[in-house]
Amino acid sequence: MNWKTATALSTLYDYAVQNRALSRLGARILWNYDIANLHRAISTQDPTALTLDIPCGGGMAVRGPRHVAADLSATMLHRALRKTNTLVQTNIYALPFHPATFDACVTYNGLHCLDAPAAAIAELTRVLRPGGTLSGTTLVRGTNRDPLITAFQRLGIFGTPGTTEDLRTWLTAAGLRDIELTPTGAVTAFTARK
């Protein structure tokens, strides 16, 4: 599956995520996760911080004019245009930004779709200013939802998700500190500081 060209899947995914009732039901049934946790995390973002949101999807996490929405998928960026006009189509492994550009980077529900999540975390850390925060959520292995994760991998929708401990290792290896991990169901929320 190539998220860059999967127009129908991208549109369907964004519709479900943006619909409160569908996202609540889907998150609970599929991942044993209360989507309200994600909405709370998004609501705590500082709208005055220069923030990179990647993959931004349809822009659900956009929180102000200093928010740069980035995604590999042109379909997702088109949908995010409803919330911001600061859009960048890019690959998460080679961000077109100078080192130490952003006060914060957020990556909600995207790392598990990647083949090299550790490399993505390292690249996000590169563009963070000293003292900046990286936060997000990702599906993780090591729960009773592993068979479903494997099925999504076989369909090419997911890349190589790790466990919560793998996530800690990736964040630490990228040079991040003050790491906080909050596993709930098959989702782990995380925050770390550069």
Label each residue range with its predicted role.
Residues 1-46, 60-61, 76-79, 135-158:
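Conserved class I S-adenosyl-L-methionine
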Residues 159-174, 179:
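Short alpha-helix
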Residues 179-194:
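Core SAM-dependent methyltransferase catalytic element
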Residues 50-94:
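Class I SAM-dependent methyltransferase SAM/SAH-binding core
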Residues 118-130:
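A short glycine-rich, Lys/Arg-flanked "PGG" loop and its adjoining helix->strand segment in the class I
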Residues 104-116:
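A short SAM/SAH-binding and catalytic strip from SAM-dependent methyltransferases
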Residues 93-105:
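A short acidic, Gly/Pro-enriched loop at the edge of an enzyme's catalytic core
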